[in-house]
Amino acid sequence: MKKNSPLVSIIIPCYNASYYIKEVLESVHQQTYPEIECIIINDGSTDTTLDIITNFKNSHFHIYSQENKGLSDTRNFGLEKASGDFVFFCDSDDILPATAIESLVTPYTGQENIIIGKTANYSWETKKIISYLPHLDEKQFFENKNSEILTLNIIKNLSPIAQNKLYKTEFLKEQNLKFLSGIYHEDELWFFETIFKAENVLFIPDVTYYYTTDNSHSITKNHNDKNLYGYLSVIETIYNKYYLQFPQREIIAYYIAHLKKITIGNLKNHSNYSNEALQQMESTFKKVNPEFKKNINLKNIEKQYFIYVNMLSLKDSATIKKEYFNNPVNSLRKWFKILMFSIFNKK
């Protein structure tokens, strides 16, 4: 690898992206950093996506087409084809600022496994930035010896998207990191696994990604049983593959509770989950019941909150909804319960 000019492989999976993909590819074409290759995979599109990407002329663009396999398998295919020193994932409806890759590569010192930029929520229709995903305001480097970034994510609720992160290819290969096939919310698991195993991670304050928020076909807009099953698969995988196998059980336990909180939170606006899916949630939550210890870098009230969330998750789905949402003073009541639980456990 050339330290000052490493090759970056930008991986773009495409499925029925004809409305967006030309502008996305233009944003890659306009990158100020010259050492890039773009791997574009048509994942069985039924619209004109393949025609558009085939007609886009750029010697650095490598185009592949396959039967529909889903996002995880398509990204994994991109990883197999990537020849860069780094890989960068971009969705087929998102935009890269012209200096995105240059901003991510420039601070590389030779030791970072992952470099993370700031993500802007972007309206495709108005071409304006709406807001920003949670991020660190200043440039910050982590050796991550005690999984500090997982703790940071629990506190700050950092976005777990796979995009807008420069991953060192050697690191991904050494750790045999791939996306779990056949589930929704594969990014949640990918974020956990990559951050858990990374030794050196750099956050930079530069905006290096425009994340489209008004695509009605995004899975964040379409909530059904697969959505719930996806979260449950992530929780079970982390529990079985990491909590039961690695010594860092304390942080993993709290991270599982963090994911349970997200899963429970989705119940409020997505009440159309089937009874079978809710029963599966109850079964998974009861099976995944980690032990919580307090020698972790969280404030006591935060620890008690996640312990409370885990306790709540062991109840039936109707009780979970009632406890978490139905009372108009839910927020005050919830924090009162946490406070009382904290006081009780000090005695």
Predicted feature locations:
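N-proximal low-complexity "stem/linker" segments adjacent to membrane-targeting elements
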Residues: 1-29
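Glycine-rich, basic loop-to-helix element that forms the pyrophosphate-binding segment
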Residues: 66-82
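Donor-binding/catalytic cores of nucleotide-activated saccharide
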Residues: 71-72, 92-204, 209-226
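Short aromatic/hydrophobic "clamp" motif used to bind/position activated sugar donors
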Residues: 87
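Catalytic core of nucleotide-sugar-dependent glycosyltransferases
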Residues: 206-215, 221-250, 262-265, 269-292
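Membrane-interface aromatic/basic loop that binds lipid-linked glycans or pyrophosphate carriers
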Residues: 271-347
